Amino acid sequence: LDTVPHIEMYKEYEGRIRWLRPEEAQRLIDVARPHYFADLIIFSLNTGLRQGNVLGLKWNQVDLERKVAWYHPDEMKAGRALGVALNDTAIEVIKRQTGKHPTFVFVNKRNNPITDINSRYWKESLKQAGIEDFTWHDLRHTWASWLVQRGVSLRILQEMGGWKTLAMVQRYAHLAPEHLHEHAEILQSLVGTDDTNRAHRRN
C-alpha cells in the first residue's frame, strides 16, 4: 500500500464531572437561604433530579406517605417513567412548600411557578460560597458522586437516576475504586518488602 488507510477510532464520550464536597454544598446552601432556591438546591442534592424535573414537580406526583415522587415517561429525558425515592431531607423540603401553590410544589418568592433559576442569584451564591466552575446540573453530578463514594453500585445508581443505559453512569466508576484493592494486592510482595517476608512468601 502506498498510503495507510484512515480508520476512525471510536472514542467513548466522557462528560464533564464537577461535584462538591459536603462542606462546600452546605456552604452554598447557607448563602442561598435568603433566596427561594435554597430548598431547590437541598432537594436536588437529595434526589439527583434534573432542574426541569424539580421545577416542574406537581403535588399530584408526590406521595408523602410512601415517600415517592412519580414522573411519567414524557417528563423524563430517557423517555422512561421514574419513581424517585424521597429521603427524610427531601420530604422536609416538600413539606415546607405546603400551601404556597395548588399545583406546583416549588414556587418563587411571589408564590408563582418557577420557569428557570435566576442566574444572577445563582452566580452571587456561588461567588459568596467560594465555588467556581459549577453549574446547576452539577448538583446531579454531586448527588451521583456522593452515592458511588458511599458504596452504591452503578446499576442501582442508574435505576435511581433514570439513566437509559449503564454506560451513562460509568463516568462515576472511578470514584469507588475499592473493588480493585484485591487485584492490587497481587503485586504487593514482589518488591519493596524486607528479605525475611519475601523468603517466607516464596516458601
Feature-to-residue mapping (PLM):
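Basic, Lys/Arg- and aromatic-enriched nucleic-acid-binding interface segment
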Residues: 2-55, 65, 76-81, 100-101, ...
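Catalytic-site neighborhood detector that most strongly recognizes the C-terminal catalytic loop/helix
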Residues: 11, 19, 70-79, 91, ...
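Mobile genetic element proteins and their domesticated derivatives, centered on retroelements
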Residues: 21, 28, 122, 169-172
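Short beta-strand segments
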Residues: 8, 42-44, 70-72, 86, ...
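Short, polar N-cap/turn motifs at the start of nucleic acid-interacting alpha helices
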Residues: 61-68, 132-133, 152-171, 182, ...
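C-terminal catalytic core of tyrosine-transesterase DNA break-rejoin enzymes
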Residues: 42, 46-53, 140-164, 171, ...
